[in-house]
Amino acid sequence: MLKTLHLKNIGLAPDLRVDWAPRLNLITGDNGLGKSFLLDLAWWALTRTWAGMAALPPAASKNPQIEYVVQGKAGEAKPVVSKFRRSDETWPVDAKRPPMPGIVVYIRIDGGFSVWDPARNYWRSDPGRPAAYHFAAHEVWEGLDVGGQRVCEGLERDWVNWQEGRKPQFKALEEALRVLSPVAEPLRAGPPQRLFIGEGRDRPTLLIGSQTVPVALASAGV
């Protein structure tokens, strides 16, 4: 997990240190104060990649740097310091393997999702692997292609595959639906069905009350 993030001369303030709590952290403030910027930097500290544009300090900033501490599954958590290199506008860090924080998921301000999986996104011997997977909102449902290769089938296809194959992932999905449901109106997975004329695949459905509702047509709140 990310334990600390210490910023110097990169935009939010001349000197800003955040000590993160072990589980839930709330960041509040008016528009334009840098809440999303802080989350972008937290993502970078955990994954050493950027979910969008890299953080660029103001031209007048002297010696901008980022210092952070990430606690992995094993080993001592040591501070990592990156000093901005203006010649190529990068934040260099040591080439050694970063700590293993586990899978990192970032729900971005634009409605998309970024996912970093150390088992799939970090291999020094295979630099051609994607640095991370960045999903637009529709790609979470419909799937993601990277460099002409299908890397994710999307939740709709996975849902039907898990359900028809009676796979353990479907049990986890059912439990997630149960936990997220209103007490008086539980959400349950319904039978897959064809939705659009001429479509060659089934889509997942939800049982909401006495009705079967295709997930693709469910309300935005659901």
Where are these regions (language model features)?
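Extended helical coiled-coil dimerization/tether regions that scaffold
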Residues: 71, 134-221
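P-loop NTPase switch/coupling surface
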Residues: 1-148, 161-171, 179-182
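Short amphipathic C-terminal alpha-helix that caps PH/PH-like domains
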Residues: 42, 221-222
